[in-house]
């Protein structure tokens, strides 16, 4: 029928010229006038395309669905399924698409890999569009459905970012922890930096220490490795577990590139443990190493403990000289004040009551500042 063909070709030509509204109107007249035309499936498919380009997804789905129902084995049906898939994926409703494909008997075309890919694509589209809540829901569905999925790392990374955007710290930490456990990947450094920061701030020190330690292993810059190891030291110290502090100190000592701050703070912590365990000789050995630089609080404290050890061994002349030498090195104020208090005790031991009184008088003018906390969050190479 030439009239039939002409009517269809007119509508198709409009679509070819991207005159979609005119094309849709002509093709709708065509299928109404020629319901039994052999070109009906083609016209329905073209209508689905026209309305998709016009932004009317509901009408597009209607016509694509008509193609699949009336001519399921046709090439037009396969094209219609692609259009239907695109609409569902763009709306983040990939599971609805899978249900639809199963209902119309087209699920055989969906391999496990294509299902994986489509599910992630739908979630990613929502994430990139800034639809955080919808993206999080879709990403959670992907992670549950494809625990070994090809895009699992990407999904976990995007999901953790969604949680951070909405202030769900606990869920963010859980997701970041899962991603950190997937082995080294493109997100490892960023993930471990954020995970260590969040867990430290939340006083989850064991988790923070583990994250900092992993970060040291994966980061490639010198500064990054030093900061990571410093964080590892401080998180472990904040946790307060003596056995973990001992293991951490040994671990750091075995890594010369851990950085001066981490090496110093871990060595001092180990010396403190030894002193608490009455292993004074071993502690003093470490204190002597740290005492070489009194600009840091650890160095100032270590040098003072060396003075204290000399005093306790009974050599008052040596202790006196050492205290004056210590004062000339400009240690931190708290430990300098402690040293002058010790000097007064030296004079008492020596029977020099005049000097003892003079020292006591001078130290009343000294206000001893507090030492502060030994543990701080990671913040570069602080003294």
What function would you assign to each model-found segment?
Residues 1-383:
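Acidic, polar-rich low-complexity tracts and alpha-helical solenoid repeat scaffolds
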